[in-house]
UniProtKB/Swiss-Prot annotation:
Gene: ugpB
The keyword Cell membrane is assigned to this record: no
Recorded GO CC terms: cell envelope; periplasmic space
Alphabetically ordered keywords of this record: Periplasm, Signal, Transport
Function: Part of the ABC transporter complex UgpBAEC involved in sn-glycerol-3-phosphate (G3P) import. Binds G3P.
Signal peptide: 1-25
PANTHER family xref list: ARABINOSE-BINDING PROTEIN-RELATED (PTHR43649), SN-GLYCEROL-3-PHOSPHATE-BINDING PERIPLASMIC PROTEIN UGPB (PTHR43649:SF31)
Binding-site list for sn-glycerol 3-phosphate: Y67, E91, S146, S272, G309, Y348, R399
Protein name: sn-glycerol-3-phosphate-binding periplasmic protein UgpB
Subcellular location: Periplasm
Amino acid sequence: MFNNSIHKVSICIALTLTFSANAMAVTEIPFWHSMEGELGKEVDSIADRFNQSQPDYKIVPVYKGNYEQSLAAGIAAFRSGKAPAILQVYEVGTATMMASKAIKPVYQVFKDANIDFDESVFVPTVAGYYTDSKTGRLLSQPFNSSTPVLYYNKEAFKKAGLDPEQPPKTWQELAADTAKLRAAGSSCGYASGWQGWIQIENFSAWHGQPIASRNNGFDGTDAVLEFNKPLQIKHIQLLSDMNKKGDFTYFGRKDESTSKFYNGDCAITTASSGSLASIRHYAKFNFGVGMMPYDADAKNAPQNAIIGGASLWVMDGKDKETYKGVAEFLQYLVKPEIAAEWHQKTGYLPITTAAYELTKQQGFYEQNPGADVATRQMLNKPPLPYTKGLRLGNMPQIRTVVDEELEAVWTGKKTPQAALDNSVKRGDVLLRRFEQANK
């Protein structure tokens, strides 16, 4: 009996050691991101399902603040030897990441892990933003790509005598509609999130105008800014005039206007297509989604939208097993059913052709009118060399400059021309600084 007890104890110890060894064998992969609220919940859900699908790797999502904060945290962590394996970085951080010497290109990650990966699965206009201009190879993996869209309150439109199925197509129509909406009781006619991205960068591309020389920086770091031209000045003047009348309200530099919209304060907002998840969740009224307005007097408009959002960068300095786990997770993200679900639940673009086709086959766009607006904007016309995106060094800082100058317009301290001229002047100083640092 005594021997039998010893035998049972030995079995228990052996099983405990086995389970402990298995637990220790799991490779944890930190994934720093900037998805909060409903978006963060979906990131957690995807990570959990990947973790349950295999026994070797555990993705650990960690929210690290907004895009600017997470980029700064990621670079600082790399310098101290404590970087995550995966870092989500917004699109204007691309040039910074390329020059940082802190990354391992995605194509190299897959190659080293001996995992086949077809880069052609991505929608070309999305992948093109994150590829090496010289080799055409993918440096980071597209994840949450977006374009700006127009959200409008159908009930407010109906109350103002406007057609709730017809959002404004031009900026001139939007200006007229907001006046009617305000007269009908809306405290805020129009507001915009991400003013630099929407009112300067995407406005320029949507009208076939370059943001900078050298094809918006794709052809070299010696680019200069060019968004202080008559069409852009005219547009900011229109917004300034609306602001003085009380028809356009400025709430902040990021996506503050989104909550003002879904709370019912603002009748119209332009915001990221990725805001759709929050608007769906919180809005207690019928709303619609329309394309970005264009200037009625501009020739050949609209052209195409350029993407925002972010991609996933793999940080350098990790071990072989970590990189294999990273490769498997990135491969998991582009499975048609996973990529399609992410697109459908969040409002971000379908990043692969297969995800787009699957979404159509499932009847999602028919059941959710407006859900395909972001995609249609991106594919509206074949992109010109200077409307496929932008790759400018110190772009996060340039956006801050643009924000400061536009805020001077909204407060009446500067004219649109003076603000855009100074934005270009100050921005070019930042471009030259980046160019010198990366020669």
